[in-house]
Amino acid sequence: MIYWIFLALAITAEVIGTLSMKYATVNGQITGHIVMYIMITASYILLSLAIKRVALGVAYALWEGIGILFITLFSVMWFDEPFSLTKLAGLAILVIGIVMLKSGTRKAQGDSGLKARQKERHHATV
């Protein structure tokens, strides 16, 4: 469960970092850039912790996909970026793809399965 929390925090940090970058660009303040660097760094660190137990493909798809979804929505609300039916359709397809990817992923075997496979590789056969 903690690894999913790491992933949620990574997504949140990515969204905050990216929005801070836009804020800094619009307002010309260095604070936005500093927040961006800190949050993007935190996002990658948290993502690396999350993929210890969450499948990489699922974690990355959720990290990027949900990040794109929230960044787009907040950009429309806060920075008056245009929104169209085409963007809405793209976001809907994105969400459908994430759901399909998540539902099609098997549960990880855990460390014991991985360690057993690694031991098999290191033993010589006679």
Swiss-Prot record:
Q: Name one GO cellular component term.
A: plasma membrane
Q: Where along the sequence do coiled-coil regions lie?
A: none
List the membrane topology term(s): Multi-pass membrane protein
Q: Where does it primarily localize? A: membrane
Alphabetized InterPro entries for the sequence: Small_drug/metabolite_transptr, Small_multidrug_res, Spermidine_export_MdtJ
Where does the chain cross the membrane?
A: 1-21, 30-50, 54-74, 81-101
Q: Which keywords does the record carry?
A: Cell inner membrane, Cell membrane, Membrane, Transmembrane, Transmembrane helix, Transport
Molecular function via GO: amino-acid betaine transmembrane transporter activity; antiporter activity; choline transmembrane transporter activity; spermidine transmembrane transporter activity
Q: Which Pfam families match?
A: Multi_Drug_Res (PF00893)
Q: Where in the cell is it found?
A: Cell inner membrane
Which Gene Ontology BP terms does the record give?
glycine betaine transport
Q: List the disulfide bonds.
A: none
Query: What is the role of this chain?
Result: Catalyzes the excretion of spermidine.
**Database matches in PANTHER family:** SMR FAMILY PROTON-DEPENDENT DRUG EFFLUX TRANSPORTER SUGE, SPERMIDINE EXPORT PROTEIN MDTJ
Concerning HAMAP family, the annotation shows: MdtJ
Q: How does it assemble?
A: Forms a complex with MdtI.
Q: Which family does it belong to?
A: Belongs to the drug/metabolite transporter (DMT) superfamily. Small multidrug resistance (SMR) (TC 2.A.7.1) family. MdtJ subfamily.
* Alphabetized NCBIfam families for the sequence: PRK10452.1
- The name under which this protein is listed is Spermidine export protein MdtJ
Which lineage do the record's taxonomy fields give for this organism? Bacteria, Pseudomonadati, Pseudomonadota, Gammaproteobacteria, Enterobacterales
